[in-house]
UniProtKB/Swiss-Prot annotation:
Entry's Gene Ontology molecular function annotations: mRNA binding; translation initiation factor activity
Cytoplasm recorded as keyword: no
Name recorded for this polypeptide: Protein translation factor SUI1 homolog
Chain coiled-coil ranges: none
InterPro entries tied to this protein: DENR/SUI1_TIF, SUI1, SUI1_arc, SUI1_arc_bac, SUI1_dom_sf
Family assignment from sequence similarity: Belongs to the SUI1 family.
A Pfam family matched in the record: SUI1
Amino acid sequence: MSDLCGGLPPDICEQLTKEEQFIKIKVEKRRYGKEVTIVEGISNDETELKKIASELKSKLAAGGTVKNGKIELQGDHRDRVKELLIKMGFPESNILVIE
């Protein structure tokens, strides 16, 4: 990551990266009427996605996974996910909740 930030301190670099991301949160119906919350657009870094997914699953008490660069959480958690992402430092203006 230091290569991308041109010598900026890591915390400033991390904040800049979060501000550049446009995040979409939506719910899909799967088999047997089960709902899955999809969070996309966060990061292309698999380890970063897994870390965020783990924190979301823990806070929401829900199962989930990371697939194809997206976080999938069991159940409809759109509004709560948005709140948690804002607390993690993502700007509210870059988070779109699709109804």
